[in-house]
Amino acid sequence: MTNDPGSTQRGRSRGATQSARPVAARPPKRPSPQWRRMDLHLHTPGSNDYQEPYISYLDILRQASARGLDIIAITDHNTVAGYAAMQKEVEQLLWLESRGRIDPLEQRQLDEYRRVLDKLLVLPGFEFTATFGFHILGIFPPETPVSYLEHLLLTLRVPPALLREGSSTVGATSDVLTAYHVINEAGGLVIAAHVNSGNGVMMRGLDFGGQTRVAYTQDPNVHALEVTDLEKRGNQTTRRFFDGSKPEYPRPMRCIQGSDAHRLIRESATSPYLGVGDRVTEVLLDEVSFEALAGVIRGNDHSLTRPYRGTAKAVDFVQLAREEGESLVQAFHPTMNQRGGHLDNILRDICAMANTNGGTIYIGVPADAKAKPEGVREPARAIEALRTTLAKRFSPEPPVQIDSLPTQGTTVV
């Protein structure tokens, strides 16, 4: 919770000879390709199975930036509602700024969006559930209108009533091959999601004919396969299976990995539920753009993608603050319960910071950096209760921005 107080041209020819012989201009030097990090399978609170519905869209972008990602795709279940909500939030802040009606807290939020989006390419998309429950990622250029993507989902027979629900179960929709074709024809990247696990088109554990599996993984309209074992080695990996060495699977398939994140940060090292940037693919690009990415994903040079094996960990901003310790601009409270005077202590700190240089108050975590934080149960409800209390107890109400942050598997305010 943050408290905020009040004409010389370059490139001339070296000269012409007396016979006016033209001098050929040198073509501009192309930038050297660089390895870029991408996570093309991220969910948001726009998916109804998202595990932390109180997380903001800005939180997700911040985490992606903190993990060193260059490209992400928002791929909620059978909807683009999450991406649309993020887009609408940014547009609203820009509108307020353009009319001089933006308050300091909103300005800080907009500035943070600008900072993150200046470094991060965010692509719209969806995770479509085809017939028999198979999952397919469709990823599109950033300028693609939300209405176009919603029309595409309707074309794929997602029921209109469920178009903004973010549900992974939407009844009888289009089959896998039709979905591949429709998404590809619409200009999207077509990636079969987590093919070697649940809802994957490898159909493990399902009694389907071999020709169906071949068609679902070799169709010319599918550009890549997302796998969960890309970093494993040996002869039994999914990438080895689809390397073109099998007569029945002659087309070598590009295999990439994505986090399929349904939460901001992985709860523990053994949890199967990954966070943003926990499974990353590196891609060699001349520039960070959808066009450059599409050129690689649709191409045949499989050496241009590889699993990212870096050791970068998610930044725990709360723990960093605890290690710095309490100060005039930083305070910690293990709980906001009224009993024991905890809420009153929080209000005193708010009042003090509002009348000085501002600061940040962390609720749900003790100041001792070695103590395990308890966190705040139902953060969204706690934030609303705190807003109500501030409105009742202060006049004028101090400018306070209240957010939730993850730390050590729990959430603080």
Enumerate the predicted regions with their spans.
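Charged catalytic cores and adjacent phosphate/nucleic-acid-binding surfaces used
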Residues: 1-69, 81-95, 112-124, 130-146, ...
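A conditional alpha-helix N-cap/helix-loop micro-motif detector
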Residues: 53-54, 169-173, 343
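Active-site neighborhood of divalent metal-dependent phosphoester/pyrophosphate hydrolases
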Residues: 74-79
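Short acidic, low-complexity segments enriched in Ser/Thr/Gly/Pro
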Residues: 144-160, 166
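Surface-exposed cleft-lining segments at the edges of enzyme active sites
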Residues: 158-171, 333-338
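Hydrophobic, aromatic-enriched interface-forming segments
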Residues: 169-207
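Conserved N-terminal catalytic/coupling substructures associated with nucleotide/phosphate chemistry
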Residues: 288-413
